[in-house]
Design a protein with these regions (language model features):
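Outer-membrane beta-barrel translocator domains and adjoining extracellular loop/strand segments
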Residues: 1-8, 49-57, 102, 106-115, ...
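Flexible, solvent-exposed loop segments that connect beta-strands
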Residues: 58-65, 107-118, 156-173, 214-225
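Outer-membrane beta-barrel strand-turn architecture
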Residues: 19, 29-33, 45, 83-89, ...
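C-terminal beta-signal and adjacent terminal beta-strands/loops
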Residues: 47-48, 136, 148-164, 187-228
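Outer-membrane beta-barrel signature, preferentially recognizing the C-terminal barrel domain
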Residues: 1-38, 43-46, 57-84, 120-125, ...
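Gram-negative outer-membrane beta-barrel transporters
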Residues: 42-46, 63-156
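Transmembrane beta-barrel domains of outer membrane proteins
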Residues: 26-28, 40, 80-84, 130-134, ...
Length: 228
């Protein structure tokens, strides 16, 4: 049972193994010791990707299971930077940045009621940055880390029935909305002894899960959302 989404989860004995083909083109530059700049273009093809999907249930609670899609294609660009900050007078400090932009599209089996969407669990962008302090002479280490991911599908919706027969039922995709996360850590060595302190998710922002559904109101198309 998933308490965050208030839904039951069941297995699927008919699942097929997923296969991934990956191609990437990467440029890397190392300006000095401990520094790196890299840019990568990548493409991934998924065959039979496994997704967490809403399935029909006779009960009142939603039920999710793991289902194979026909395929999926992901492509994008990734940038990775590691830089010492001595050049601006911040000795023993360094900075890192990792960011990615990803375009994702799922391929569906013929005859289904699905519409174009990204692969479940895939965010359109990822951002990770960090500020680090390292002083080996005095035994100090510290870091501030920031993370953010774009809106992503965590539960694939489904469509059942036929509009012409009056039994159509639409279960929208469930999305995890973007949130900011900051982690702090510091450590100090005393000979062979090390003391370390860590604070995770300093901002403690709420997790929001939303469903969006297109409806017609007074002859105009609108999108309504439900928040959990």
């Amino acid at each position: 049972y998933d308490f965050d989404l208030g839904s039951s989860v069941m297995g699927n004995s008919s699942l097929q193994a997923a296969y991934i083909q990956n191609v990437d083109l990467r440029y890397e530059w190392y300006p000095s010791n401990g520094e790196q700049v890299s840019i990568a273009l990548f493409y991934k093809h998924f065959e039979n990707p496994i997704e967490w999907t809403y399935t029909m249930s006779g009960g009142t609670d939603p039920v999710y299971s793991y289902v194979n899609a026909k395929g999926a294609n992901n492509y994008g660009i990734e940038v990775d930077i590691r830089k010492n900050l001595d050049f601006i007078g911040m000795r023993n400090f360094s900075f890192s940045f990792n960011g990615a932009w990803i375009k994702s599209k799922v391929q569906f089996k013929e005859g289904g009621n699905n519409i174009d969407r990204p692969m479940q669990g895939q965010s359109p962008y990822l951002i990770n940055t960090g500020l680090f302090y390292n002083n080996p002479d005095k035994g100090w280490n510290a870091a501030v880390l920031y993370n953010r991911i774009g809106k992503r599908i965590i539960g694939v919706g489904n469509r059942y029935g036929s509009s012409s027969e009056g039994d159509a039922r639409n279960i929208p995709n469930s999305y995890e909305m973007p949130r900011n996360s900051i982690d702090l850590s510091a450590s100090k060595k005393f000979g062979k002894l090390e003391i370390k302190a860590t604070v995770r998710d300093l901002l403690a922002e709420r997790y929001y899960f939303k469903q969006f559904e297109d409806v017609i109101v007074n002859g105009q198309a609108r999108t309504i959302e439900e928040v959990t």
